C-alpha cells in the first residue's frame, strides 16, 4: 500500500499524538494523515493544484499494528466496537482513546462514499478520501520527501497586470 502525505510545511520530526478525550460526532483522530494512492485518494477527491504542498511517501513499519478498513462490513464492525452516542447527541462518535490503545493508526481504503450520506456517521463523512491517520510514530519506518512545494507557482504562471 502506497501512502502519501501532503503538507504546506516541511516535516522535520514525527511525533506521536494523544487522542482527543472529547467524544463528539465530528471528532476525528489526531496524527499524521496520509492518502492511500489510487482510486478516491486525496488528489482525486480534492481537485486543486497540490504544487504548493510538500509531498511525502510514508512507509509503515508493521502493518499488523494498523487497523485497516476496506469495506462496509469492516466499517460496521469498527463502529460497533468503538462507536458511542454522546448524551443528547443523535450522531455516533468514536472513542479514539480506546482505538489508540489497540492500534497505532487507522486506514480506510477504499473510500466508502455511500456512508457519507448517513447523518449518524458524520465523523466518517469528514474522512474525505481513501486515507488514514497514524498517531503512533513507531508505526512509521520511513517518511521520504518526494516533491518540494512550489510556494508561488500561481503568480509565476499568472503575472499580475501592471
Short names for language-model regions:
Residues 1-21, 47-162:
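Active-site and NAD+-binding cores of ADP-ribose-processing enzymes
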Residues 12-41:
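Short, flexible N-terminal segments of the mature chain
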Residues 41, 46-47:
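Hydrophobic alpha-helical segments that drive targeting, anchoring, or assembly
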